[in-house]
Amino acid sequence: MVQITKGKFDGLQRLSNEKGVIAALAIDQRGSLKKMIQQAKGTENKKDVEDFKQLVSEELTPYASAILLDLEYGTPAIKARHEGSGLLTSYEKTGYDATTPGKLPDLIEDLSALRIKENGGDAVKILVYYDPDEPAEINEIKYAFLERIGAECRAVDIPFFLEPITYDAKVTDSGSLEYAKLKPAKVKASIKEFSKPRYGVDVLKLEVPVNFKYVEGFAEGEVAYTQDEAARHFEECSDLSPLPFIYLSAGVTSEMFHKTIQFANQHNVQYSGVLCGRATWADGIEVYGKQGDDALREWLRTQGKENITSLDKLLDEGAVPWWTKYGSFEDVHVVEKQ
């Protein structure tokens, strides 16, 4: 039996499909999306970013239980989403200050959990870069930061989705073989830390614990893990988390993310869905940049739709309801916030 306050429960239900699985689309990218559109189009314009997000939301949210957006460029997309699609809202500033050690997080100054809720948000999402092996003086700042967010979300009774992105302060190339060998331990450490009740996290938005580019049978070159080792890392991460968790696509291709989810399904990992971003819509940027709105709309109605609906089928086969970590749906006791 677990007690969940009504606001958090209602938010989680609005973000989930009829099976309790979070089949969500992510397009809260800001700086990176702006650069991608600028490269494809040759010009920089805030409206281009807004329009791209709006078209993605309009065309793809009929196939998603929820969408993750920002309020900087995403307001038109929020209004354009399908009526049955829930809304997660980003609270953190994009990127980090590269002149300061530790990739420290920061919040959007004119936003709060209350304002996110007032704007129709069903959950607050925070991304934090995390290296469990960095000095305590850096990580304690991040811990206190997340404790404050958790308290704020509890106060206004809205779900808190935390996205810890792991890194190594010394191995700076996150796509390297060297980092691939470190990644499983980093992801496990982030799960152990941020599952603690002090943070008030409701759902963990996790990286998969391996880089599939280096998994035997998937790798084209060097190998960091056998398939059995990769499976063990998936299973250990699943067992470590007392909280519901979903996977993020982390900028990989649609094909690679589908293979990743198939792998999780084959090994009975207890994940409760995905927040899939670039894997779904990134190939549409070039179409938008070179051919405009109508061409992007057509791409979204064909390839974009195929990307998301084929992923939905995989979730249908393997994802478990968000309440599975607590037992059955009947084991979730909904209480009014005091």
From Swiss-Prot:
Source superkingdom: Bacteria
Signal peptide: none
Keywords on record: Lactose metabolism, Lyase
Entry keyword annotation includes Lipid metabolism: no
EC number: 4.1.2.40
Annotated transmembrane regions: none
Gene Ontology terms for molecular function: 6-deoxy-6-sulfofructose-1-phosphate aldolase activity; tagatose-6-phosphate kinase activity; tagatose-bisphosphate aldolase activity
Reactions listed under catalytic activity: D-tagatofuranose 1,6-bisphosphate = D-glyceraldehyde 3-phosphate + dihydroxyacetone phosphate
UniProt key word Cell division: no
Main EC class the enzyme belongs to: lyase
BP terms from Gene Ontology: 6-sulfoquinovose(1-) catabolic process; D-tagatose 6-phosphate catabolic process; lactose catabolic process via tagatose-6-phosphate
Family matches, as InterPro entries: Aldolase_TIM (IPR013785), DeoC/FbaB/LacD_aldolase (IPR002915), LacD_aldolase (IPR050552), Tag_1.6-dipho_adolase (IPR005927)
Pathway(s) served: Carbohydrate metabolism; D-tagatose 6-phosphate degradation; D-glyceraldehyde 3-phosphate and glycerone phosphate from D-tagatose 6-phosphate: step 2/2
Family membership: Belongs to the aldolase LacD family.
HAMAP family referenced in this protein's UniProt entry, alphabetically: LacD (MF_00734)
NCBIfam families to which the protein is assigned, alphabetical: PRK12399.1, PRK12858.1
Name of protein: Tagatose 1,6-diphosphate aldolase
